[in-house]
UniProtKB/Swiss-Prot annotation:
Its main location: nucleus. Belongs to the TFS-II family. This is Transcription elongation factor A protein 3. Residues 134-144, 160-170 have a biased composition (Low complexity). Residues 5-82 form the TFIIS N-terminal domain. GO terms for molecular function: DNA binding; zinc ion binding. Keywords: DNA-binding, Metal-binding, Nucleus, Phosphoprotein, Transcription, Transcription regulation, Zinc, Zinc-finger.
Length: 349
């Protein structure tokens, strides 16, 4: 077995150790690597440096980590040596071909400030690139100022892409159609005003009231913002609830009351979901509340103990029941049952 095949075998073993998080036997393999005469071509073809560096990062054995650092340091010195090995000449030939095609190595250098994670991922290939870059800098030093200027211009061009505040897909910045007098200077707030105005215009009847919907939406948004003092998630949820209720086709009375002035902008900005609900929904909620109160506040001691009913949860028959007239006199009585074992309640007529 040649040295290259043996290095590939050791590299696979080390990678498996790192993947399984079991580095027993890594010390013997590293000692074996330290006794060999290494070349740049072997480092490049076998990528043994990547495997050793992975052991160095994930192993908890101090002796293994120390030996891995020594090997990596020695191989770095080999890469940085003034003599030009065969592997480096091969890279120079590839570099020359790229230049003939109009490609520049500076276009893909990962050593700018825009890509720091790539430096941490793999150290051995980084060192190989460093040696190639040092070689190219010695032969083409007059081009360095222009390369630095291009890198600085790239970094300047990238800085405006960083968002100043978190944004949700609902309020993503887009072209705003509001009049300049209603713009706030904040893209999130402007988008909210635009969406509130669209909710007020959900039906064509807004024309009958002769109301400026953009102005009214701006006033509603301003009241919300003045109360919450930020455009965080609480602010956005407040705006969403106004929009959904104003656009609800089953609750047109709310939007008409806002358009007519019966509900002011300051009031709609603070109303709860229950207050904005339609009369039909309020009655349904009240009925459900009264039913729940009647079920859960029924006195336990006033019932009759029986074994005629079986609980659906605990499957036992230790129950107490009450019969109450919840509807008209000619309707059958409602039986409320309470399980004395698990507390489960149910009813039937």
């Amino acid at each position: 077995m040649g040295q290259e095949e043996e290095l590939l075998r050791i590299a696979k073993k080390l990678e498996k150790m790192v993947a399984r998080k079991k580095t027993e036997g890594a010390l013997d393999l590293l000692k074996k690597l330290g006794s060999w005469q290494m070349s740049i071509q072997l480092l490049q073809t076998t990528r043994i440096g990547v495997a050793v560096n992975g052991v160095r990062k994930h192993c908890s054995n101090k002796e293994v980590v120390a030996l891995a650092k020594v090997l990596i340091r020695n191989w770095k010195q080999l890469l940085d040596s003034p003599a030009t090995p065969k592997g480096e000449k091969g890279e120079e030939r590839v570099k020359a071909k790229k230049k003939e095609k109009g490609l520049d190595c500076s276009d893909w250098k990962p050593e700018t400030s825009l890509s720091p994670p790539r430096k941490k991922r793999v150290e051995e290939p980084k060192d190989r690139r460093d040696s190639v870059d040092s070689k190219s800098s010695a032969t083409s030093s007059p081009k360095r100022p222009s390369m630095e200027r291009s890198n600085s211009s790239k970094s300047k061009a990238e800085t405006p892409r960083t968002p100043s505040s978190p944004s949700s897909p609902t309020f993503a910045p887009s072209v705003c159609l509001l009049a300049p007098c209603y713009l706030t200077g904040d893209s999130v707030r402007d988008k909210c005003v635009e969406m509130l105005s669209a909710a007020l215009k959900a039906d064509d009847d807004y024309k009958d009231y002769g109301v400026n919907c953009d102005k009214m939406a701006s006033e509603i948004e301003d009241h919300i913002y003045q109360e919450l003092k930020s455009t965080d998630m609480k602010y956005r949820n407040r705006v969403r609830s106004r929009i959904s209720n104003l656009k609800d086709p089953r609750n047109p009375g709310l939007r008409r009351n806002v358009l007519s002035g019966a509900i002011s902008a300051g009031l709609i900005a603070k109303m709860t979901a229950e207050e904005m609900a339609s009369d039909e929904l309020r009655e349904l909620r009240n009925a459900m509340t009264q039913e729940a109160i009647r079920e859960h506040q029924m006195a336990k001691t006033g019932g009759t103990t029986t074994d005629l009913f079986q609980c659906s949860k605990c499957k036992k028959k230790n129950c107490t029941y009450n019969q109450v007239q919840t509807r008209s006199a000619d309707e059958p009585m409602t039986t409320f049952v309470l399980c004395n074992e698990c507390g489960n309640r149910w009813k039937f007529c």
